[in-house]
A protein has these predicted regions:
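Alpha-helical transmembrane segments and membrane-interface helix-loop junctions
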Residues: 1-171
Length: 171
């Protein structure tokens, strides 16, 4: 049962990263098409800027848990690298706890924003009208996944500081 849950979680996490990659590629294509159309004197689609802005938010949210899993995010260990192992472990557990709490708070508030935008049928008015809930849709789920990844670190499934600085250089 637990093994199936872990496999499902990993599957979703990896597909979130794949979807983030697809989205960033689509935004690249949209920008190239928009600029090319402008250069050749055609009128580009009005929705490009608004959709690319949405894609950037979705990309950041969908990629965050996966980047945390592979330790590809930015973290500063300039001080902790010189500390004794026990002190480093205690500091790491405190940092993980703070990150779990903050991600959970963001998850809760993002869920409230998503619910409010859905219930009130709010619309984001830009070059195109788009339901506002689309903007908030990935936030609660992705912050939940981020909190879960930090919980993995907290309980010892993995450790954010298990790699040396030189090992992280390639990430």
């Amino acid at each position: 049962m637990v093994n199936a849950l872990v496999k499902s979680y990993n599957f979703v996490l990896n597909w979130m990263a794949v979807f983030a990659g697809i989205l960033i590629f689509l935004s690249f294509v949209m920008i190239v098409v928009d600029v090319t159309m402008r250069i050749v004197g055609l009128k580009p689609p009005l929705f490009t800027i608004a959709v690319v802005e949405y894609i950037l938010l979705w990309f950041a949210m969908l990629a965050a848990p996966w980047l945390l899993r592979i330790k590809g995010h930015v973290f500063i260990d300039a001080v902790t690298q010189f500390l004794p192992k026990l002190v480093k472990t205690v500091i790491a557990k405190i940092v993980y706890s703070i990150c779990i709490v903050s991600s959970s708070i963001y998850c809760f508030h993002a869920a409230g924003l998503l619910r409010e935008a859905w219930v009130k049928e709010m619309v984001d008015v830009r070059s195109i009208d788009m339901p506002l809930w689309i903007l908030y849709a990935p936030m609660p789920f992705c912050f939940f996944f981020v909190a879960t990844e930090f919980a993995r670190y907290l309980v010892g499934v993995d450790d954010m500081y298990s790699q040396t600085i030189l090992e992280r250089e390639g990430v």
